[in-house]
Amino acid sequence: MKIQKEIDFILAVDALKNVQRRNYNADDSRRENTAEHSWQIIILAQVLFPYAKNNTDIDLLRVIIMLSIHDLVEIDAGDTFLFDEVGMQGKFEREKIAAKRIFGILDEPLSTEFYNLWIEFEEEETPDAIFACAIDRIMPFILNAHTSAKSWTEAGVTEKQVRAMLENAICRASDEMDECFKALMELCLKGNKLVRN
């Protein structure tokens, strides 16, 4: 069958539904899985796209594809909590091996196209990747600010950590996202959802 590799790929990436993340969903009832996170950031990218800096230089379809594939590596590498300093060590290398295997299920040129998009996202240098990264980083912040922030309070996440890992990544993408970052930070600090430091 001509599309067998595509079917093999889509069946393989179904495993993303089984990758549990640290963040809780919006009703605070359970942890989200990575497939749910991917879906949510794809929607968020579309609704925040009008606010992206220099959005005429951004290809929204490329951003959507980037967001839909960038976490597929978690099928093999697992979800690494952004504020887990030990877990973050070697993350890129683990995920690069996973990317080669997972995208390698597909034939060329799609295998290389997906791998290159994944690398572009990780490098955060192009307008598409900067916007995609901002979307990926702001979504957990939104969830934590509007819930009990269990994933952050359980880990003792500090204001300094959030500023170091999220502020530039989010704020450089949009003036409105910069404003949102400040409002979310204030909400988290007022609600004691972060350790002040």
Located regions from the model:
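Alpha-helical, largely C-terminal catalytic domains
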Residues: M1-N197
